[in-house]
A protein has these predicted regions:
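Single conserved hydrophobic/aromatic residue that forms the stacking wall/gate
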Residues: 1-13
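Short, conserved glycine- and acidic-residue-centered signature motifs
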Residues: 5, 68, 124
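Conserved Rossmann-fold dehydrogenase catalytic segment
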Residues: 14-19, 40-64, 107-114, 144-146
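Internal alpha-helical scaffold of NAD(P)-dependent oxidoreductase catalytic cores
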Residues: 23-57, 65-100, 134
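Interdomain hinge/lid region at the active-site interface
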Residues: 51, 55, 99-101, 105-165
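Short acidic/histidine-centered micro-motifs embedded in hydrophobic/aromatic stretches
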Residues: 78, 92-96, 147-154, 171
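Short polybasic/polar patches that bind polyanions
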Residues: 80, 136, 156, 170, ...
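Short, basic/aromatic-enriched C-terminal tail that caps enzymatic domains
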Residues: 164-180
Length: 180
């Protein structure tokens, strides 16, 4: 019976408040035997398939998180450049379809330029590199992932490697010549 090392989607704050999401790959009997242990550490435990499926699911998660932060950064810089208060935009959007857990966690950090690490840019670069490698190995096309990986690499090269990944806003601030 085999259970792969489960992957966890979290940042420092989610680990502190116990809302870690575990994505597990391995055989079902072993998963059933050990899932309660994982529930003691997190709020969500999902068997995603056989050995390796948990890791692949984590890579998919990281693509979505990075893409969400990128989209939020672009949208909020657009609003700011157009003269709309970012806090008003956040209040207006967060309850609708575009609202998300990522937006709720990261926009206040962006508005306050608080890039104290929850999940570091350098760790996200590693995950996106792994996602690109996985995509290439299975023949998946992931152009957005390539773009966001380049943005994160820019952040690393410009001193934000140890910052929270919400520092993506710095890239857009530089391009737009405006602070959020």
């Amino acid at each position: 019976s085999t259970l792969s090392s489960s992957s966890a989607a979290s940042d420092v704050y989610k680990r502190q408040d116990g809302t870690v999401a575990f994505m597990v790959g391995g055989d079902e009997n072993t998963f059933e035997k050990y899932k309660e242990i994982l529930f003691k550490m997190g709020s969500s435990v999902t068997r995603c398939g056989e050995l390796g499926a948990g890791n692949t699911t984590k890579l998919a998660n990281q693509i979505i998180v990075a893409g969400n932060i990128q989209a939020v950064s672009e949208a909020f810089i657009l609003a700011k450049k157009a003269g709309v208060n970012p806090e008003c935009v956040f209040e207006a959007i967060k309850g609708g379809l575009a609202g998300s857990t990522v937006m709720n966690a990261k926009v206040p950090m962006m508005i306050n330029d608080d890039v104290k690490p929850g999940f570091r840019v350098d760790l996200h670069i590693k995950d996106l590199n792994n996602a690109l490698e996985c995509a290439h190995s299975v023949g998946a096309v992931v152009p957005m992932t390539s773009q966001i990986q380049e943005i994160m690499q820019y952040l690393h090269n410009n001193g934000d490697g140890s910052s929270d990944h919400s520092a993506i806003i710095h890239y857009y601030e530089k391009l737009a010549d405006i602070k959020l």
